[in-house]
Every structure is written in structure tokens, then in C-alpha cells.
Amino acid sequence: MKTLVMGGTQFNGLALVRELAKHGHAVSVLNRGKTPVELPLGVARLTADRTDGAALRAALANHDWDVVYDVTAYRPEDVHLMAELLRGRVGHYVFVSSTVIYAPSDRLPISEDFPVDRSPQQNEYGRLKIECEDFLVREQRERGFPATTVPLSMVFGPNNILPDREQRMFARLLAGRPILIPGDGSTLAQVGHVEDQARALRMLAQNPRTFGRRYNLTGAHYFSAEGYVDTFAAVVGVAPNKVFIPAGLMDDLYAGRVLLARAAVNAKVDIRSKERAGEIIQQRFLLTMLVQRIAPHLHHWNKSVVFGVDRLREDAGWKPEFSFPAAVEHTYAWFRSQGLHESLKCDWSWEDQVLALARDYKH
């Protein structure tokens, strides 16, 4: 199949390009051409800044595609223009969304028919992803535009452009640092391996059953916060020095009753957000660096958040190949192969503040 990946040079997009090329697809990527990366042999490169409508029109002119995977659409105007340019010229348009769209729920797992969150607590990223999905559903229903939306949850694996997730945990354990765990460590979460997610996206291609539908895409296994730490420690081969943050202190940190000095954050992602989070929300996101958590602006620190993937299994025949321990093992092997066990630099000052508070906390 003739496929186009919007982006295609970092993490999710790069894994998808490699998966498609491995299975014989004629793959093109479209991006600004600024990220140095080795792509599989035969992958064609189209260059344009998608925020420049004229440049995007020129780059896509005279092309038809069997499938277009849009990994870099963050705003409604992105998908509006893609629908305009691709109408009648694409067999399937797959929009990569995010599970941040969903409202908090006490019923788990969260499936595709659960309510989305349009409340004031939703952030700009989530609001705009919802608007993108709304538009594509209308386009499919009213004009037959062959669109599918795929919300990803926390993605895990080699080349992650958010080093403060799994890579930071490897670094903590290797440095012998205390491992901070929120509350009693029983809260459940879930990640998906980037290569499993690339396979799922490939398997969705040109399946008419998926048109106009949403598919959650993440791992099949859940883990507790303490289980997350224990799994990492077993893979790294160390005994973790676990420090449990008292629930009362976590409540104070989440509510902003205790505010700490900020630390540097490692990230290479640009979601073109114009919104700047307030100090309390920023602190909540810093807390998710301790043990991975999704959407702390919506979900309280001690609320389990997991997503169902049964629809994807049923309609595309996909199932994850990586268990959670296998995903950690695979990612740690990559981490060491890249020399990150020696070169990754982390700012621990914020964690040190939390550690001091946890040790001195009076119940």
C-alpha cells in the first residue's frame, strides 16, 4: 500500500514508518526536514511545515494515498486542511489522538464509548484533540471521509522523546537514589509499547469497519505504582530503596497547598500549545515523573486509570506482543545500547524536596 506518515522521524512516527516499511508498504513521510534520522531504505521524504497551508498544499499536490497516518495533528485547523486536501484522494485517514480526551471515571477500564471531558479542567491539548475528533466524525458521517481516530495512552519504548518517564526511572535505580512512590503504591496505570502500537496502526489500514470509529491503543496489562518500580528494579538488577509519600502530603502537593521550586524537565516534544499551565498543574505533572501517570489535570493521584483495547482486538485482530516486564526489558536494552546509562542527565532537585517532606511528614 502507498502510505504517508505525517511526521515520521520521532518516536511514535518513526516506529510506525519502520513497521510499515518492514511489511512492504511504499512509505513517504512529510515533515519540516529538521530532525536528523536514518529512515528505512526506500522511504520518500516530503518537506513542508504543516502550519504553512500553501506549503502543505504544494507538497501533497498530485499525490493519492491508500492510507495517511496523521501523527502530528494537534489542532482542528490541521485536520480541516487535511480533509480538504485528501478528500477523494485517500483510502483511509488515521488520526492519532490521545486518551487525555476522556473524563475521569470510577468504572474501569475506560472504553471508547465513555464520555470525553469538555470541562474547564481539560487542558488545551485535550480540548483540541476532542475538536479534531468531532470534526472527523462529522466528515465521515456527512461526506463519507474514511477517517479513524486512535487515542494513544502513555507510550513506552526506544527513542521516547520524554526522557523523564521510563528513562528517568532507569537513571534513578542506577544511581541508587530513593524511589518515591505516591501513597501506598496501589494505584493502577498502564502503558503501551511503541512497537506494539505501530503494529496496531498498520493492522487498522483500509479496514472499512473502522471508519468513523475510535480505537483506544495502549498495552493490555495494568500495573500498580509499586509494581512499576519493582518491575524496573528487577530488570536493572537492583534492590529499590522505596520511599512511600504519605497520602496527606500527596493531597497537599496535588492541591497546591504545598508548592515546591520547579526543576528542569527533559522533553523534545512540540505540541504547538499556546496555553501555559498554572503552577499547581505544573506541579502535578512533575509528580507524574515519579511513576508514570496520565492527565494529572483530570485524574487525582490515587485514582486508577486504565483503558480497554477490546475494540481494537475485535476489529483489527491486534493484540500486544509485549507484556509490561518485556517492554521494560526491551527498553532498558536500548537505553544501555545508546549509552544513556552514562550520559542521561537528570535534575533531581525537585525530587529531593519531595523526599525531605516525605521523611519529615507528621501524620
What do the predicted segments below correspond to?
Residues 98-123, 138-143, 160:
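Active-site "gating" loop of Rossmann-like NAD(P)-dependent oxidoreductase/epimerase domains
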Residues 133-159:
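Conserved beta-loop-beta element that borders a ligand/cofactor-binding pocket
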Residues 324-363:
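Amphipathic terminal alpha-helices
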Residues 63-110, 130-137:
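NAD(P)-cofactor binding segment of oxidoreductase domains
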Residues 163-169, 182-205, 212-213, 226-227:
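Substrate-positioning beta->alpha
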Residues 203-296, 309, 358-363:
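Mid/C-terminal beta-alpha module of Rossmann-like enzyme folds, strongest
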Residues 3-23:
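N-terminal Rossmann NAD(P)H-binding glycine-rich loop of SDR-like oxidoreductase domains
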Residues 6-7, 182-187, 215-222, 233, ...:
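Glycine-rich Rossmann NAD(P)(H)-binding loop
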